[in-house]
Curated annotation (Swiss-Prot):
Protein name: O-antigen chain rhamnosyltransferase RfbN
Entries under Gene3D superfamilies matching the protein: Spore Coat Polysaccharide Biosynthesis Protein SpsA, Chain A
Pfam families, A to Z: Glycos_transf_2
EC number in record: 2.4.1.377
Species name: Salmonella typhimurium (strain LT2 / SGSC1412 / ATCC 700720)
One GO biological process term: single-species biofilm formation
A GO term for molecular function: glycosyltransferase activity
Family: Belongs to the glycosyltransferase 2 family.
UniProt feature coiled coil, ranges: none
Functional summary from the UniProt entry: Rhamnosyltransferase involved in the biosynthesis of the repeat unit of the lipopolysaccharide (LPS) O-antigen region. Catalyzes the addition of a rhamnose to the galactosyl-undecaprenyl diphosphate intermediate.
Pathway given in the UniProt record: Bacterial outer membrane biogenesis; LPS O-antigen biosynthesis
EC main group: transferase
InterPro entries, sorted: Glyco_trans_2-like, Glycosyltransf_2, Nucleotide-diphossugar_trans
């Protein structure tokens, strides 16, 4: 099994040396590593150059897209059986992270696997709870049969640390070329629809979290709303996340009451920001383009958007 590891980068910052060191320590080392950089001004590219089997490709930051840029990187490696994606701020937690992730491909019907994400050591209480809630200590393999029980969680996938079977990835035409985010969920949904299975491997662990402000959470959920407005078939076929959202808020309040009660007002403000951002994102076509760009975390996405581009992405 030939493995390629792909990392999109842009000014990777202080965590980057730790990310690279963790890759070097893997018991299964990738046959090829690709860093696709969007014009970093720091030491991102020079530091990556020391990795074994590394290829570095440069693109203009204005050309970056969560789907299209990853597709471009996949096209640079023609002989890989498995493609692993890692983000520049995700640190492999132990030397067997890649080994445990790719183990699932021994089942020919499993087309994608994502790993568990634990919070960084500097994570605030909201970030700690989010990772503990969303990333269980129990592994699971999901198929069409799980949709009734799991709903949209059936197609949960995160390219912060995820692997894809190359043959199925290409069979389904890769990620959408122009998407604001959630290219990983999009692909997992296509795989499930096509009769394949996707897995969550709790034994393949990375450290990855964000201490987002309420404003940043608003922006992130605005983008999530835009994604679902552009790809409504996912919620139509797999269900919404309403019930899961209520469970998250209840769990968060319980966690904070026990561990960090002074964070409850911040949590309530953040919850409102998420809700408002998502609702506005779902109706982005009713907003001026300048407002969409202002509300969005991924601002360059809006450079080539027109209101006539309401065609469903599928």
């Amino acid at each position: 099994m030939k493995i390629t590891l792909i990392i999109p980068t842009y000014n990777a910052g202080s965590l980057w040396p730790n990310v690279l060191d963790a890759i070097k320590q893997q018991t299964i080392y990738p046959d090829k590593l690709i860093v696709i950089d969007s014009g970093s001004k720091d030491e991102t590219v020079p530091l990556a150059s020391d990795l074994k089997n590394i290829s570095i490709f440069n693109i203009d930051s204005k050309d970056f897209n969560h789907g299209g840029t990853r597709n471009l990187a996949v096209a640079k490696t023609l002989d890989a059986d498995v493609i692993i994606f890692l983000t520049q701020d995700a640190i492999l937690a132990d030397s067997d992270a890649i080994k445990n992730l790719v183990y699932y491909f021994s089942d020919p019907l499993i087309a994608a696997v994502c790993g568990r994400q634990l919070p960084h050591k500097d994570a605030n209480p909201l970030a700690v709870h989010a990772r503990n809630f969303n990333y269980s200590s129990k592994s699971i393999v999901k198929s069409k049969a799980d949709i009734e029980k799991l709903g949209i969680k059936t197609v949960f996938m995160s390219n912060s640390f995820a692997a894809y079977r190359r043959s199925v990835f290409e069979e389904l035409s890769g990620f959408p070329e122009h998407t604001i985010l959630a290219e990983d969920m999009f692909m997992a949904a296509k795989m499930i629809q096509a009769g394949y299975k996707v897995a969550y491997c709790a034994e393949a662990v990375v450290r990855h979290s964000h201490n987002y402000t309420p404003r940043e959470e608003f922006q992130r959920y605005f983008d999530t709303g835009v994604f679902h407005a552009c790809s409504p078939w996912i919620q139509r076929d797999f269900g919404g996340a309403g019930g899961e959202g209520f469970r998250f808020v209840k769990s968060e309040i319980q966690f904070l009451l026990k561990n960090a009660p002074f964070w409850i007002p911040r949590a309530l403000l953040t919850t409102f920001a998420k809700f408002l951002g998502y609702k506005l994102g779902k109706h982005w076509q009713s907003l001026p383009l300048s407002t969409c760009r202002y509300f969005s975390m991924y601002k360059s996405y809006w450079n080539n958007i027109q209101y006539s581009s309401s065609k469903e992405i599928k």
